[in-house]
Amino acid sequence: MIIIHTVYCVLGRTGSGKSTVTKEAAKQLNMSVLRSYSTRQYLRQGETKENSDHILISPDEVEKYRNDMIAYTDRVGYCNFATKQQLLDNDFYIINPTGYYELKLKTKDMDIELVTIMVNVPFSELRKRAKKR
């Protein structure tokens, strides 16, 4: 199989700095970060619809993307997903481990290489960061 596209999948716990690290790397390397779809209806402190890591949609809109979904995660009260086209159009994808597993399964016959980057932060630091959110 000839690889036609490489996607750097960034994984880590909430608050580990995945978005910060990924956005800076993408900026320095002139690469793009995939903004996955999310039915999460709240914005975090300092977040707007424009600067969010996600494209915020209503639960009613999910079905129209169903045939093109490549990584779907059902969270507590909302879901996140990306489409095949988004994957092909971007270089980095910030994704949780459950979504990454599905992504691996659904891309095994595609000419895409997935490179995993884990962002690890001590639990004590995660706790501090969570209190600031």
Model features per residue range: what roles?
Residues M1-H5:
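Phosphate-binding P-loop
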Residues V10:
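Hydrophobic anchor at the beta1->P-loop junction of P-loop NTPases
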Residues R13:
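P-loop (Walker A) phosphate-binding loop of NTP-binding proteins
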Residues S16:
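ATP-binding Walker
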Residues S19:
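Walker A/P-loop
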Residues K27-R35:
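Post-Walker A helix-loop "phosphate-sensing" segment adjacent to the P-loop in P-loop NTPases
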Residues S38-G99:
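ATP-dependent small-molecule kinase phosphotransfer cores
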Residues E63, A82-R133:
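ATP-dependent NMP and nucleoside kinases share a basic, alpha-helical "lid"
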